[in-house]
Amino acid sequence: MSASLTGVFNITPTPFHDDGRIDADSVRRLTDFTRAAGVNGMTILGVLGEADKLTERERDEVMALTIEAAGPDFPICVGTTHAGTDGCIALSRRAQEMGAAAVMVAAPKLARPNDSALMRHYLAVAEAIDIPVVVQDFPPAVGGITMSVELIAGLGAATPRLAYLKLEDEPSPMKVSQVRAANPDITIFGGLGGMMFLEELRHGAAGTMTGFAFPEILVAIYRAWLSGDRDGAATIFYRYCPLIRFENQPRINLALRKHIYHRRGVIATPRARAPFAAVDDGTLADLDDLLTRLDLQPGSDA
């Protein structure tokens, strides 16, 4: 399964009913929609999947619904970040038991660990399971903890299961180059809403793992790049850059993403669980204007 961990992995939000319950039909519809977009796989229960707001039972429900809808030949990566090593191991084992192709793990933020502590944490998780661990390097989500290039390279050298990186430490293209130079065997995914996807590819990334609500656009960029049509990839990227930038605004990116999926008829409501940053009518009007200008209103194809 590790050979399939490349290309575009769309990170999906967790759909809720208006009363806050998991919306099973929307989870299935979102999975079908994402697969139909042509992505290489999906990632669930990440930061914008509101994983921290779910109970253990709800995590299992989302995993079961997604993995069943995806089918056995479509890889699902599951976020299993936890503040403690034992907790992360338990979540990762559970994801493997339920059929996950890989897990995604960010640094445990409460302990403010150094490189040695992070090495021990990740090795313990990797040794406890038989599937790849995507190391998430995203300082804003973990209290500012930054992973050094040496640590990342060392993780990949220690075991092939840790030779996967979701790099979101800005400026990401520069760090892609640095990690590639330190350990060329590491498979690097970009993130950050896709904002630097083209540049990350230029610097050696193998794809992107992010939640942009028009995954078919990221797929088109990636396929053009993979075919050798670098100008074509750039043309697509620069056309849709305004939307990528708009959707990935700090604090409101979750709300915007859910509103877009709702407008596209993929999820029944844009409901997020409290606490979250809502968007106002003016921002939604800006979104509608942008979608109209890019011919991306509901029912249209990118």
Predicted regions and their residues:
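Short, amphipathic alpha-helical "lid/cap" segments that border enzyme active or binding sites
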Residues: A24, R28-T31, V149, L284-L291
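Catalytic alpha/beta core domains of metabolic enzymes, predominantly
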Residues: P139-Q249
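Active-site beta->alpha loop and helix N-cap motifs at the rims of alpha/beta catalytic domains
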Residues: S2-T146, G154, Y261
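Short, low-complexity, intrinsically disordered N-terminal peptides in bacterial proteins
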Residues: M1-S4, S300-A302
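A general structural signal for well-ordered alpha-helical segments in protein cores
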Residues: V27, R59, M63, C88, ...
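C-terminal alpha-helical cap/extension of soluble enzyme domains
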Residues: F9-T14, A37, R202-A205, A213-A302
